[in-house]
């Protein structure tokens, strides 16, 4: 079982762009970050820090293009600022709502949490990756974004909005509401 522990933060913008950043504090690859970017035309781009991580993520999820680029990050308790050669972005979130039981079985995540995750956030906590592996998203804390700003190639993307339409990177999209989620991804 491979476990990735970190934070996924996401939202859409008036431009139609949707951005997801994963900041992984612990993983089989050590600490790293990746960006999933859905353009208004539906094109899906993965920005990864190196080819090994890019190939691994691409084996799990669907992308039209993989870019290898430095992802520069500054983070505090409730804010992330990051940039690549194309993207500049800042996410800020508010109160974090914790899940009361941290160590819960994966069967619970794939049944009870799956039901409530879909009902409330329109997201799935369990499914199969592109290459057929089983994956669980174990949410530890969730919070609504209170501000987000982004530029692509120097052009502002406008006001932050819900993550819509779905990007279909994998079996689940992030919450439809602009959100930051402390999460553990288990991949079998």
Predicted feature residues:
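Short amphipathic beta-strand and strand-loop transition segments with alternating hydrophobic
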Residues: 21-23, 69-73
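N-terminal ordered "arm"
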Residues: 1-43
């Amino acid at each position: 079982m491979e476990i990735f522990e970190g934070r996924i933060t996401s939202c859409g913008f008036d431009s139609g762009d949707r951005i997801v950043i994963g900041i992984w504090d612990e993983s089989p690859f050590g600490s790293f970050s990746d960006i999933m970017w859905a353009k208004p035309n539906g094109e899906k781009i993965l920005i990864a820090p190196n080819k090994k991580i890019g190939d691994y993520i691409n084996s799990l999820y669907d992308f039209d293009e993989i870019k290898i680029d430095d992802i520069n990050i500054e983070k505090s308790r409730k804010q992330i600022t990051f940039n690549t050669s194309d993207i500049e972005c800042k996410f800020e979130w508010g109160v974090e709502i914790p899940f009361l039981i941290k160590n819960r079985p994966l069967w619970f995540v794939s049944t009870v949490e799956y039901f409530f995750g879909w009902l409330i956030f329109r997201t799935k906590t369990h499914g199969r990756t592109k290459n057929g592996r089983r994956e669980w998203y174990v949410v530890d804390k969730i919070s609504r974004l209170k501000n987000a700003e982004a530029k692509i190639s120097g052009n502002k993307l406008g006001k932050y909005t819900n993550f819509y339409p779905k990007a279909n990177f994998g079996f689940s999209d992030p919450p439809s509401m602009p959100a930051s989620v402390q999460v553990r991804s288990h991949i079998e």
